[in-house]
Amino acid sequence: MELTLASRDALTELINIGYGRAAGALSELTGYRIMLEVPQISLHEIASIGPMLEDILDGRVASVNQAFTGSMSGNALLLLDESSAIALSRLLSEDRSVDARLDSNAREIITEVGNILLNACLGVFGNLLRVPVSFSVPMLSVDTIPAILESVAHRAREPLQFGLMIHTRFRIKTGNVTGYMVIVLGIASLDRLMRELEQWEQRQMQ
């Protein structure tokens, strides 16, 4: 299955709305002006996502994982390599003594960033596509990409066959941090998403 140009444009618009809401919430929370650049979105079979992410994200990766259920089900993840997660926590923290490792303070910051970002994007899907979903409590893990994806697949309610990879860049003060949001879905949930995107596009043209 591939994204049509229209579906990619619609997804980009929806995710961008979610990013705008997340950036506003993060800016209010931290007191800093935070921007999230327009996302770049691609769809891949789950078997190819692991190797692609391993090429992009070096070594151990900080992952904030949030399962969602409802008319569509799957998992949404915010992925940052460890150095990027540390850099992001430093940019967002008033504590200049943040260690050169993901200590408890840094983990708390990254978990909250993931919670805000993932909730904003999944909430847009629910509200604008009219597909209500409920979310689990976000979970942070620091591990390799294969271990993270294996854990997600093990807990999934249906076989996860596809993933939307969403390139994410945070702009905060003088710093930029790059990561990825990945939404993994089974075939039935992906079909539902594509149908709802088409209907949303039709409503926009009315």
Task: Give the location of each predicted region.
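Composition-driven recognition of glycine/serine/threonine/acidic- and proline-rich low-complexity segments
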Residues: 1-206
